[in-house]
Amino acid sequence: IPGDNTAMRSITAYVDSRGEVTLIGSARVLLEDHAPTMIGNPVAMITEDFPALWRDACALLTDNGYRGFANFDVKIDPRDGRALFFEVNPRIGRNNWYMAAAGANPMIPMVEDLIDVKACEQTQATDEILYTLVPDSLLLHYITDEDLRARVKRIIREGRRFDLLLNPTEKDLRRNLTVWLQKQNHRRKFAR
Protein backbone atom coordinates (compact mmCIF):
# COMPACT_ATOMS: atom_id res chain seq x y z
CA ILE A 1 0.00 0.00 0.00
CA PRO A 2 1.61 3.29 -1.02
CA GLY A 3 1.83 6.31 1.23
CA ASP A 4 4.19 7.71 3.82
CA ASN A 5 3.82 7.62 7.61
CA THR A 6 1.05 10.23 7.50
CA ALA A 7 -1.30 7.66 5.93
CA MET A 8 -1.24 5.68 9.20
CA ARG A 9 -3.80 6.03 11.97
CA SER A 10 -3.67 4.82 15.55
CA ILE A 11 -6.91 3.99 17.38
CA THR A 12 -7.00 3.27 21.11
CA ALA A 13 -10.06 1.77 22.80
CA TYR A 14 -11.15 0.15 26.04
CA VAL A 15 -13.99 -2.36 26.23
CA ASP A 16 -15.32 -2.79 29.76
CA SER A 17 -16.39 -6.04 31.44
CA ARG A 18 -19.99 -5.49 30.20
CA GLY A 19 -18.79 -5.37 26.60
CA GLU A 20 -19.25 -1.60 26.18
CA VAL A 21 -16.59 0.57 24.53
CA THR A 22 -15.96 3.17 27.23
CA LEU A 23 -12.85 4.79 25.73
CA ILE A 24 -12.05 5.70 22.16
CA GLY A 25 -9.57 8.03 20.52
CA SER A 26 -7.31 8.25 17.51
CA ALA A 27 -4.38 10.03 15.97
CA ARG A 28 -2.84 10.61 12.58
CA VAL A 29 0.72 9.36 12.59
CA LEU A 30 3.18 11.98 11.37
CA LEU A 31 6.45 10.11 11.73
CA GLU A 32 7.45 6.58 12.70
CA ASP A 33 10.75 5.39 14.10
CA HIS A 34 12.91 4.04 11.27
CA ALA A 35 15.31 1.98 13.38
CA PRO A 36 15.10 -1.69 12.28
CA THR A 37 13.86 -2.89 15.67
CA MET A 38 11.41 0.00 16.09
CA ILE A 39 9.68 0.14 12.68
CA GLY A 40 6.00 0.87 13.07
CA ASN A 41 6.35 2.77 16.35
CA PRO A 42 5.13 6.37 15.98
CA VAL A 43 7.37 9.13 17.29
CA ALA A 44 4.94 11.93 16.38
CA MET A 45 1.14 12.03 16.02
CA ILE A 46 -1.70 14.55 15.90
CA THR A 47 -4.89 13.53 17.65
CA GLU A 48 -7.82 13.61 15.29
CA ASP A 49 -11.37 12.28 15.30
CA PHE A 50 -12.08 9.58 12.74
CA PRO A 51 -15.74 8.68 13.42
CA ALA A 52 -15.99 6.06 10.65
CA LEU A 53 -12.84 4.31 11.89
CA TRP A 54 -14.15 4.51 15.47
CA ARG A 55 -17.40 2.84 14.39
CA ASP A 56 -15.53 0.07 12.57
CA ALA A 57 -13.14 -0.51 15.48
CA CYS A 58 -15.98 -0.56 18.03
CA ALA A 59 -17.98 -3.00 15.91
CA LEU A 60 -14.98 -5.30 15.49
CA LEU A 61 -14.40 -5.35 19.24
CA THR A 62 -18.00 -5.70 20.43
CA ASP A 63 -19.08 -8.18 17.73
CA ASN A 64 -16.29 -10.52 18.83
CA GLY A 65 -16.83 -10.29 22.59
CA TYR A 66 -13.53 -8.49 23.16
CA ARG A 67 -12.67 -7.09 26.61
CA GLY A 68 -9.85 -4.78 27.69
CA PHE A 69 -7.56 -2.37 25.86
CA ALA A 70 -7.07 -2.50 22.12
CA ASN A 71 -4.77 -0.53 19.86
CA PHE A 72 -5.37 -0.60 16.10
CA ASP A 73 -2.94 0.22 13.31
CA VAL A 74 -4.85 1.44 10.26
CA LYS A 75 -3.55 2.70 6.92
CA ILE A 76 -5.54 4.88 4.56
CA ASP A 77 -4.94 3.82 0.95
CA PRO A 78 -4.30 7.07 -0.96
CA ARG A 79 -5.52 5.50 -4.20
CA ASP A 80 -9.12 5.05 -3.07
CA GLY A 81 -9.31 6.37 0.51
CA ARG A 82 -10.12 2.94 1.96
CA ALA A 83 -9.12 2.26 5.54
CA LEU A 84 -7.18 -0.98 5.93
CA PHE A 85 -6.96 -2.36 9.45
CA PHE A 86 -3.51 -3.95 9.75
CA GLU A 87 -3.66 -5.29 13.28
CA VAL A 88 -5.15 -4.96 16.71
CA ASN A 89 -2.80 -5.19 19.67
CA PRO A 90 -4.46 -6.62 22.80
CA ARG A 91 -2.91 -3.95 24.98
CA ILE A 92 -2.66 -0.24 25.29
CA GLY A 93 -0.19 1.19 22.79
CA ARG A 94 3.33 2.32 23.61
CA ASN A 95 2.33 5.86 22.71
CA ASN A 96 -0.98 5.87 24.59
CA TRP A 97 -0.04 9.08 26.39
CA TYR A 98 -1.52 10.94 23.41
CA MET A 99 -4.94 9.88 24.73
CA ALA A 100 -4.46 11.54 28.12
CA ALA A 101 -2.98 14.67 26.51
CA ALA A 102 -6.09 14.86 24.30
CA GLY A 103 -8.41 14.71 27.30
CA ALA A 104 -9.11 11.00 27.79
CA ASN A 105 -6.94 9.34 30.44
CA PRO A 106 -7.05 5.61 29.56
CA MET A 107 -6.75 4.56 33.20
CA ILE A 108 -10.01 6.17 34.33
CA PRO A 109 -12.45 3.87 32.48
CA MET A 110 -10.38 0.82 33.40
CA VAL A 111 -10.32 1.70 37.11
CA GLU A 112 -14.04 2.51 37.11
CA ASP A 113 -14.72 -0.84 35.45
CA LEU A 114 -12.38 -3.18 37.32
CA ILE A 115 -11.78 -1.50 40.70
CA ASP A 116 -14.92 0.57 41.32
CA VAL A 117 -17.07 -2.00 39.46
CA LYS A 118 -19.32 0.61 37.92
CA ALA A 119 -20.45 1.50 34.43
CA CYS A 120 -19.21 4.72 32.90
CA GLU A 121 -20.09 6.81 29.90
CA GLN A 122 -17.86 6.61 26.84
CA THR A 123 -14.88 8.96 27.01
CA GLN A 124 -13.56 10.29 23.71
CA ALA A 125 -10.16 11.87 23.11
CA THR A 126 -11.24 14.91 21.10
CA ASP A 127 -8.75 17.69 21.94
CA GLU A 128 -6.33 18.34 19.07
CA ILE A 129 -2.75 17.98 20.30
CA LEU A 130 0.66 17.10 18.91
CA TYR A 131 2.28 14.16 20.66
CA THR A 132 5.97 13.98 19.80
CA LEU A 133 9.20 12.41 20.98
CA VAL A 134 11.43 14.14 18.40
CA PRO A 135 12.66 17.73 18.00
CA ASP A 136 10.22 19.97 16.10
CA SER A 137 12.74 20.76 13.36
CA LEU A 138 13.27 17.03 12.70
CA LEU A 139 9.53 16.38 12.55
CA LEU A 140 8.84 19.31 10.23
CA HIS A 141 11.67 18.21 7.93
CA TYR A 142 9.84 14.93 7.22
CA ILE A 143 6.33 16.33 6.72
CA THR A 144 6.00 16.92 2.99
CA ASP A 145 2.31 17.93 2.87
CA GLU A 146 2.28 21.73 3.23
CA ASP A 147 -1.20 21.88 4.81
CA LEU A 148 -0.25 19.27 7.38
CA ARG A 149 3.04 21.06 8.05
CA ALA A 150 1.17 24.35 8.63
CA ARG A 151 -1.23 22.55 10.98
CA VAL A 152 1.66 21.14 13.02
CA LYS A 153 3.30 24.58 13.23
CA ARG A 154 -0.01 26.09 14.41
CA ILE A 155 -0.44 23.46 17.13
CA ILE A 156 3.14 24.06 18.33
CA ARG A 157 2.60 27.84 18.31
CA GLU A 158 -0.63 27.43 20.32
CA GLY A 159 1.25 25.44 22.98
CA ARG A 160 -0.53 22.14 22.38
CA ARG A 161 2.67 20.15 21.83
CA PHE A 162 3.22 17.32 24.30
CA ASP A 163 6.45 15.42 24.84
CA LEU A 164 6.27 13.29 27.96
CA LEU A 165 10.06 13.47 28.38
CA LEU A 166 10.13 17.27 28.54
CA ASN A 167 8.98 18.29 31.98
CA PRO A 168 9.78 21.87 33.05
CA THR A 169 9.65 20.88 36.73
CA GLU A 170 12.50 18.38 36.24
CA LYS A 171 15.68 19.97 37.57
CA ASP A 172 18.00 16.96 37.62
CA LEU A 173 20.94 17.80 35.36
CA ARG A 174 21.74 14.15 34.55
CA ARG A 175 18.15 13.43 33.56
CA ASN A 176 17.92 16.54 31.39
CA LEU A 177 21.23 15.67 29.72
CA THR A 178 19.97 12.14 29.04
CA VAL A 179 16.78 13.51 27.46
CA TRP A 180 18.77 15.97 25.34
CA LEU A 181 21.08 13.16 24.17
CA GLN A 182 18.05 11.02 23.33
CA LYS A 183 16.69 13.84 21.14
CA GLN A 184 20.05 14.13 19.38
CA ASN A 185 20.06 10.38 18.89
CA HIS A 186 16.79 10.71 16.93
CA ARG A 187 18.55 13.18 14.62
CA ARG A 188 21.36 10.67 14.09
CA LYS A 189 18.97 7.77 13.44
CA PHE A 190 16.88 9.68 10.90
CA ALA A 191 20.00 10.98 9.12
CA ARG A 192 21.01 7.42 8.18
Locate the predicted segments by residue.
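Feature representing long, continuous alpha-helical segments
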Residues: 55, 86, 105-109
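Conserved metal-phosphate-binding beta-hairpin within the catalytic cores
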Residues: 61-97
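Phosphate-binding site of ATP-dependent enzymes
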Residues: 1-35, 48-55, 76, 82-84
